[in-house]
Amino acid sequence: MLSWTVILTGIFMAYAVGSLAGGHFLSKILYNADVRQVGSGNAGTMNVLRNLGIAAGIMTFIWDTAKGFLVVTLGLKGGGAELGVLMALAAVAGHNWPLYWRFQGGKGLATSLGVALAVYPAAVPPGAALMGLLTFLTRNTDLATLLTFSALPIYFWWREGPGCYLAFGLGLAAIMLLRHGPLVISLFYNLKERR
């Protein structure tokens, strides 16, 4: 049984590491710019790709995926699946809402990929396939993301694994609902206004 000190330290560390947005650092280092001041205003891979180029986008994707994978792997080795799951959710939350930059972060896709590869890699191929299909059908990555992550709890329930994996799916779905839900609602509202 892990102590509360270990659990809270792990969560804080994961949030802090998750908050280190690759897009922010790379835009400063390579271009002396703040990616949050251009395009969509977030520090994630897609905004970097669209506004700073393919190379910067790829480096941002690798950075954000790696930070999620590494911090959760550390948690899994040090405290087992339960601590790993808590740290995974904290890392994604840190990426989406970093304290360092007034909670203006990315959308969490690359970091979610990293934590999923650490916690339950078998979920990644079907998740990526579903995400690709939904993006093709809806032509909207926010809606596709929301639908894909909403399916995660169902996947883990179907797999009948330990309860912490179901909690992982529910937690990621909730985080993505908070991050992408308002964007999807805004999209539908704008479409309705145009009619």
Curated annotation (Swiss-Prot):
Q: Where in the cell is it found?
A: Cell membrane
Q: Name one GO cellular component term.
A: plasma membrane
By its UniProt entry, which InterPro entries does this protein fall under?
Answer: G3P_acylTferase_PlsY (IPR003811)
Q: Which reaction does it catalyse?
A: an acyl phosphate + sn-glycerol 3-phosphate = a 1-acyl-sn-glycero-3-phosphate + phosphate
The EC number of this protein is 2.3.1.275
Residue stretches spanning the membrane: 6-26, 52-72, 74-94, 117-137, 168-188
Tagged with keyword Magnesium: no
Q: Indicate the segments annotated as coiled coil, or none if absent.
A: none
Top-level EC class as recorded in UniProt: transferase
Mode of membrane association:
Multi-pass membrane protein
Query: GO MF terms on file?
Result: acyl-phosphate glycerol-3-phosphate acyltransferase activity
User: What GO biological process term is on the record, naming one?
Assistant: phospholipid biosynthetic process
UniProtKB keywords:
Cell membrane, Lipid biosynthesis, Lipid metabolism, Membrane, Phospholipid biosynthesis, Phospholipid metabolism, Transferase, Transmembrane, Transmembrane helix
**Pathway linked to the protein:** Lipid metabolism; phospholipid metabolism
Q: Which family does it belong to?
A: Belongs to the PlsY family.
Its assembly, as annotated, is: Probably interacts with PlsX.
Q: What does this protein do?
A: Catalyzes the transfer of an acyl group from acyl-phosphate (acyl-PO(4)) to glycerol-3-phosphate (G3P) to form lysophosphatidic acid (LPA). This enzyme utilizes acyl-phosphate as fatty acyl donor, but not acyl-CoA or acyl-ACP.
Q: PANTHER family, from UniProt?
A: GLYCEROL-3-PHOSPHATE ACYLTRANSFERASE-RELATED, INNER MEMBRANE PROTEIN YGIH
Q: What is this protein called?
A: Glycerol-3-phosphate acyltransferase 1
